[in-house]
């Protein structure tokens, strides 16, 4: 048996509240981040990802205070992203109680930053977040482009090539979000997930599009993901973490029960 596949609830945090939108817009409130994280920890989530979704866009640093509160209440690994631009930001987050940091926009502008971060803090705590959109026309070979600033700015970078490059620089994990699928609840972009999973040697977390428990299974079995990330199906009570794990186990996916 390989390593157990992880289920990771994602908390998109805007001005201190957990929110969830569709394709990065049309936002709904989902509660206090510390309360939400605590609930997932108690339910048996494998990890929590906390993304300050306004940080990169508005040039505001991630809310250290919220991370400290969360880390004091949550005992599973915590990944924090949003506005991580320099080594000092990483140190601050790790000191606040984060186990890993997620770098997105800064990695695109200064890829060397990922290398410096991995050298200083270790690859195991450096996650590179990739927001990708399909740009190929029907009938063409499938291509995906990287977007930054919460999905607002195209970069011209190919997602698969970029993922490989980030791992060469020292990323210990790739958090891969399909922006076409984000919040749409029609499943992960499995072709994208599989292409990146096959291209890199580090764990890939599939994100964007979970609408039911079968989608989680598909992300692992068809997409080749090592972990699956979801937000709205958990935040709004459609499914619980134990239900998700039981369903995945029944479908032959190894999970930590």
UniProtKB/Swiss-Prot annotation:
Domain of life: Bacteria
Pathway annotation from the record: Amino-acid biosynthesis; L-histidine biosynthesis; L-histidine from 5-phospho-alpha-D-ribose 1-diphosphate: step 5/9
Pfam families to which the protein is assigned, alphabetical: His_biosynth
Keywords: Amino-acid biosynthesis, Cytoplasm, Histidine biosynthesis, Lyase
GO-annotated cellular components: cytoplasm
Entry annotation: catalytic residues: 12, 131
One GO term of the biological process aspect: L-histidine biosynthetic process
Entry annotated with the keyword Amino-acid biosynthesis: yes
NCBIfam families reported for this sequence: hisF
Subunit structure and binding partners: Heterodimer of HisH and HisF.
General function of this protein: IGPS catalyzes the conversion of PRFAR and glutamine to IGP, AICAR and glutamate. The HisF subunit catalyzes the cyclization activity that produces IGP and AICAR from PRFAR using the ammonia provided by the HisH subunit.
Protein name from the UniProt record: Imidazole glycerol phosphate synthase subunit HisF
Annotated organism of origin: Hahella chejuensis (strain KCTC 2396)
Lineage: Bacteria, Pseudomonadati, Pseudomonadota, Gammaproteobacteria, Oceanospirillales
Gene (name only): hisF
């Amino acid at each position: 048996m390989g390593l157990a596949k992880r289920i990771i609830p994602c908390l998109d945090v805007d001005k201190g509240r957990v929110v969830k939108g569709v394709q990065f817009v049309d936002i709904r409130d989902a509660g206090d981040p510390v309360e939400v994280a605590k609930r997932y920890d108690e339910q048996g989530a494998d990890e929590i990802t906390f993304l300050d979704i306004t940080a990169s866009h508005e040039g505001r640093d991630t809310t250290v205070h919220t991370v400290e509160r969360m880390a004091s209440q949550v005992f599973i690994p915590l990944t924090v992203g949003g506005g991580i631009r320099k080594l000092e930001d990483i140190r601050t987050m790790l000191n606040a109680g984060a186990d890993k940091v997620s770098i997105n926009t800064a990695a695109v502008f200064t890829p060397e930053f990922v290398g410096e971060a991995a050298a200083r803090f270790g690859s195991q705590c450096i996650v590179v977040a990739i927001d990708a959109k399909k740009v190929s026309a029907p009938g063409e070979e499938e291509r995906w482009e990287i977007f930054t600033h919460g999905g607002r700015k195209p970069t011209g970078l190919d997602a698969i090539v970029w993922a490989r490059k980030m791992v060469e620089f020292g990323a210990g994990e790739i958090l891969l979000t399909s922006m076409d699928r984000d919040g749409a609840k029609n499943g992960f972009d499995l072709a994208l997930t599989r292409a990146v999973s096959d291209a890199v040697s580090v764990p890939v977390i599939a994100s964007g599009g979970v609408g039911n428990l079968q989608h989680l299974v598909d992300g692992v079995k068809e997409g080749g993901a090592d972990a699956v990330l979801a937000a709205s199906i958990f935040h709004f009570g459609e499914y619980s973490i134990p239900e998700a794990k039981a369903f995945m186990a029944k479908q032959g996916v190894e999970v930590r029960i």
